[in-house]
């Protein structure tokens, strides 16, 4: 699925990052915490995208593409910096907020690889745009009796 954006209106930071994404082996890492940790949603999403899930996906990604660069998106960038071992190969995208938030999804869509959160934002970032070499998604999408939604291509990797 193609997604067109008028890139002439992008900020300098986004233009530079987009250029890097398109010219190298970049993998987006999306971590959603915020509202998922609130009392309203905690019982539905707790234990789905665990630290172990991200660690296993990162390990696999580093093995299949040793030159990979990670482009991190999160509503809790500090947690990502403190908990995920990314070394010096990471960019932490913390400048798109408010009406610019959809630009994060666009940047995700341009990466060759992706490590998704259990989030439709992640899903569309993975599904749209550039052809992906590998996408990781959590085997547990939510704490609901219906299991995984039937939306994942066979080429994506469940962890």
Question: Which residue stretches match the model-derived regions?
Answer:
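Short aromatic-enriched loop/helix-cap "lid" or pocket-rim segments at secondary-structure transitions
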Residues: 40-43, 84, 147-149
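Solvent-exposed, flexible loop/coil residues
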Residues: 9, 40, 107, 155-156
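Donor-binding and catalytic core of enzymes assembling or modifying cell-surface/extracellular glycoconjugates
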Residues: 55, 59-137, 143-145
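Short polar catalytic/cofactor-binding loops
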Residues: 33, 141-142
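Proline-rich low-complexity regions
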Residues: 138-139, 153
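Residue-level detector of alpha-helical recognition elements and their boundaries
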Residues: 44, 140-141
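Leloir-type glycosyltransferase catalytic cores
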Residues: 144-159
């Amino acid at each position: 699925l193609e997604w067109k954006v008028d890139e002439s209106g992008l900020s300098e930071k986004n233009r530079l990052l987009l250029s890097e994404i398109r010219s190298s082996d970049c993998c987006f890492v999306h971590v959603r915490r915020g509202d998922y940790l609130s009392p309203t949603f905690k019982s539905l999403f707790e234990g789905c995208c665990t630290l172990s899930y991200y660690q296993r996906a990162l390990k696999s990604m580093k093995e299949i593409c040793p030159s990979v660069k990670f482009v991190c998106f999160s509503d809790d960038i500090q947690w990502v910096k403190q908990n995920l071992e990314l070394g010096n190969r990471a960019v932490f995208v913390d400048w798109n907020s408010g009406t610019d938030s959809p630009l994060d999804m666009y940047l995700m869509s341009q990466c060759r690889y992706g490590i998704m959160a259990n989030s439709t934002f992640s899903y569309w970032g993975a599904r749209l745009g550039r052809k992906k070499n590998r996408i990781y998604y959590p085997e547990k999408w939510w704490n609901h009796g219906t299991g995984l939604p039937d939306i994942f291509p066979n080429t994506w990797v469940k962890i």
